Every structure is written in C-alpha cells, then in structure tokens.
Amino acid sequence: MGISRDSMHKRRATGGKQKAWRKKRKYELGRQPANTKLSSNKTVRRVRVRGGNVKWRALRLDTGNYSWGSEAVTRKTRILDVVYNASNNELVRTQTLVKSAIVQVDAAPFKQWYLTHYGVDIGRKKKAPAAKKDAEGQDAEATTEEAKKSNHVVRKLEKRQQGRTLDAHIEEQFGSGRLLACISSRPGQCGRADGYILEGKELEFYMKKLQRKKGKGASA
C-alpha cells in the first residue's frame, strides 16, 4: 500500500454513506518525509513532481546561507547542531533539519565580516594576568597591521562605529563561536537549509526555552 492523500478510504464520523469505490489516482499520491539529517556527507535527490516540475529532496546537509537581519548581511556557514524544535523533541534527538528548527551555526564567517566592516574583533575572551604579556606582544603586531590601513579606511571605519549597536546576547554567543539560528527554508522541498540568526525578543524566547529544557534534563 502506497501513501495516499485521498479521502475515499476514510469512514465518516457522522456514519454517512461512503462514496462509490474507485482505484487510486496518481494525483492523490503521497511521498514519505525527507527527514533531512545533519551530516557532512551532503546528499540531495531530484524528484520529478506533478506538471513535470522538480523538487530537490535533501537527505543529508551540513551547510546553509544564514542572514543577520539587523546588519543586512548573509553568509554561508556550517550547521553545527540541532538544539530545539517546537513540534517534536524526537527531531532534535535525531538531528533532523526541518523548517523552523532552531540550530547552532558557526559564527566564524560573521565574525570575519564584522572585523572587516567595523574593525572590531567581537567575542574575544578576557585574558588572564599571565596571558596578558603574550597578548601585549600580539597587540603590538596588531597595531602595526592597523597602521597599514589608509586614512580613508580609518575614517570609514570610524563613521561606521558611530551607528554600531550589538545585542549583548549575540556578543556572548560570538564568544562561544556558535550562533542560534532558525531554518526558514524547507530542506525536503528545495534541498537547502537556509535561515536567519535569532535576535531580540525571539532570541530571548528561545534562550529561555533551552534553559528550561537544560534544567529539566539536570533534574531528571
């Protein structure tokens, strides 16, 4: 028995009479879910659908294009982990990529962009006193590198600095090298796992959810 989307085989809750039986039709078929897994062995299948159109069924993915809305920048980055799914915990346990799943993505491409755009290296950890001396030597190298920048570039960076704002939660995440993001594409339909970085109220909401989940896990 294939998966069928017709209502012929369903009984009426009211006890009403069923339609006259007929065979299944091609346009009533259903396909099993893609259940796209997080894996470095990227696998995308081509599916021919109604009207001769094509869908791309992603079976395994580990990268996607993620946009940082407040900075209006998009970068291709690695998906590191699936951490939350509002509909099903099983999809988190099995690391399944679906639309609206909350994932952790690699912060490196965004960190690099931020450094070139604003001249600010975000997410650097505070140094211990012993490590400070080594850091001073590195800072001296950095200053010589900074001296290489032309006056025009320096002026441009200073101008950008004036309107710069960075959410404390996002800065904290840059420190760990992982950013919380939401998948907004449908991997089983278009073969991609693209999305956006969580910010503001939405980020706070999901951070609370994850904290609560962590608390439950510790108490169990």
From Swiss-Prot:
Region (Disordered): 1-41, 131-151
GO terms, molecular function: structural constituent of ribosome
A single Gene Ontology CC term: cytosolic small ribosomal subunit
Any Gene Ontology biological process: translation
Keyword line: Ribonucleoprotein, Ribosomal protein
Compositionally biased residues, Basic residues: 8-26
The keyword Cell membrane belongs to this UniProt entry's keyword annotation: no
Family affiliation: Belongs to the eukaryotic ribosomal protein eS8 family.
Protein name (Swiss-Prot/TrEMBL): Small ribosomal subunit protein eS8
Organism: Oryza sativa subsp. japonica
Upper lineage: Eukaryota, Viridiplantae, Streptophyta, Embryophyta, Tracheophyta
